Curated annotation (Swiss-Prot):
Family that this chain belongs to: Belongs to the purine/pyrimidine phosphoribosyltransferase family.
EC number: 2.4.2.7
Species assigned in the record: Yersinia enterocolitica serotype O:8 / biotype 1B (strain NCTC 13174 / 8081)
SUPFAM superfamilies with a match to the protein in the record: PRTase-like (SSF53271)
InterPro entries in alphabetical order: Ade_phspho_trans, Adenine_PRTase, PRibTrfase_dom, PRTase-like
GO molecular function, one term: adenine phosphoribosyltransferase activity
Descriptive protein name: Adenine phosphoribosyltransferase
């Protein structure tokens, strides 16, 4: 990107081009979209934070929730840019205060996420952010945690969406509007 302010289409192309695709990782037949290559490029990283922030500037967001671990890398800077608090959702045993948990399905088995019970107040308008939307299971569990605490969540934002895996439709069924900066076809 140049020193002059790029337009949104240029920023989105730059972001997409900064994400490396690794074939056959973590197993044969998978095309892994590596967001860490975006993080290595300060212009791409800054553009992603800027575009995610712009989308929610006037939406009345009071908290941003990020899912472990790469959701922290995008959620925290967006929260800071919006002037609101950031709340981490983590794997079990990683948060020091009282928590509630929610189980969710994985390809083989189940996993669990936790959130501090005092981190979301009734009526908080919460934006959920993660790096990538695939099947939507992690975000669906995160939304359930927020709603258990009385938070209002209607939006989730991602850097990458893998639309072929159905996560957006799954979240739409839960009343969640999804926004992603870039889409990649295939698994």
């Amino acid at each position: 990107m140049t020193a002059t302010a790029p337009n949104t289409a240029q920023q989105l192309k730059y972001i997409k081009d900064s994400i490396k695709t690794i074939p056959d990782y973590p197993k044969a037949g998978i095309l892994f979209r590596d967001v860490t290559s975006l993080l290595e490029d300060p212009l791409a990283y800054a553009a992603s934070i800027e575009l995610l922030t712009e989308r929610y500037l006037d939406k009345g967001v009071t908290k941003v929730v990020g899912t472990e671990a790469r959701g922290f890398l995008f959620g925290a800077p967006v929260a800071l840019s919006l002037g609101v608090g950031f709340v981490p959702v983590r794997k079990p045993g990683k948060l020091p205060r009282a928590t509630i948990s929610e189980s969710y399905e994985l390809e083989y088995g189940t996993d669990k996420l936790e959130i501090h019970t005092d981190s979301i107040k009734p009526g908080d308008k919460v934006l959920v952010i993660d790096d990538l939307l695939a099947t939507g299971g992690t975000i669906e569990a995160t939304v359930k945690l927020i709603r258990k605490l009385g938070g209002e969540v209607t939006d989730a934002a991602f850097v990458i969406n893998l639309p072929d895996l159905g996560g957006e439709a799954r979240l739409n069924d839960q009343g969640i509007t999804c926004y992603s900066l870039v889409d990649f076809s295939g698994h």
